Amino acid sequence: MALRFVDWDCYFEEPKSDVFVFDALYAPQYIEEGLLYPLGKTIPESSVYPAWTLEQASSQGIYYGIPQMVCMDTLFYRKEDPAVARVQTMQQLYEAIGPRKTQALLPGRDEGVIADFSLNNEMKYYNILQDHTGKVVPVQAMGNVQEDAMQYLKELYAMTGTATGRYDDGNEFTRAEWFAQGHGRALYAYPEAMSAIVRLGQGDDTDVKAISSCEHPDVATAYVDYVSISSRIPADKVEAAKKLTALLTSKPYMLAALKPASKEGVPQYLLAARQDVMQELAASDPNYQKLYRHLYRAKSWHVMAGTKDFAAWEAKVGPDIERDLKK
């Protein structure tokens, strides 16, 4: 049976392909709408996955997805900066760094946080709501935009600068490169930003941590990608689809995908959901060890989860968030 790969983005449309990878944020919606094929009461090698990665993978005892990758907001900072090293919340970060001193695209070494808003402002606001309410799914707060929660998104933009925050050249590593080249006091991005930092020779001088998005303790939510099968799959393709799903989440496949192609190569520094894969990556590379210890194992994580009508809520609050940011 021949494989055909199709570009698809779960943030813009619902799944149509036989086997697909998607953000578990939409798992409740996909399961509710009957879009996912039931995988059964067990999944291959379930013991290698931390329990939290499976939080949204099943419903009523039936699995609909297998975890593949995890990702979380990450604060990168220089070892020479003890004030930032002590930070545990976004409020403390703002108190330590404050708003930008200049509005140039590239901040000086002694100012600002270079923040990556590559998902969207709605997602960052949702993350703030989680920490602000202390709930993984803050249903009661998911109405109109709350000014007290918005204040933290405004402070993050103040530390970043509007031009820097809105900048988009299509290169996901541009901000990490700026930080590695000496701009900004900190970088607020995703774990894979470590790849550009190491490539530019700054890995040994850079530390990482996860912090709360507001003044309250971190609820610690992480993005998890699940591999699933479409409920529309023809009956004669089900077994082949199950084999592909198992392959895409297997240890050999994950290690082959995440390790550099050569000894001289720089790892991608993406985080696997499987603990056995992360342990091997951490043992093979000191900067993967940082990500494993200070991110993957550092907190009692929860899967970033939404409601069954999450996409509709995003569309509703998006324009209001943009208006508030311009005030």
Regions found by a protein language model. Name each.
Residues F22-T74, A85, K209-I211:
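Hinge/lid segment of periplasmic solute-binding proteins
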Residues G134-N171:
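Glycine-centered hinge/linker elements that transmit conformational signals in sensory
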Residues D7-F20, P28, E33, D81-P82, ...:
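Short helices/loops that flank or line small-molecule/ion binding pockets
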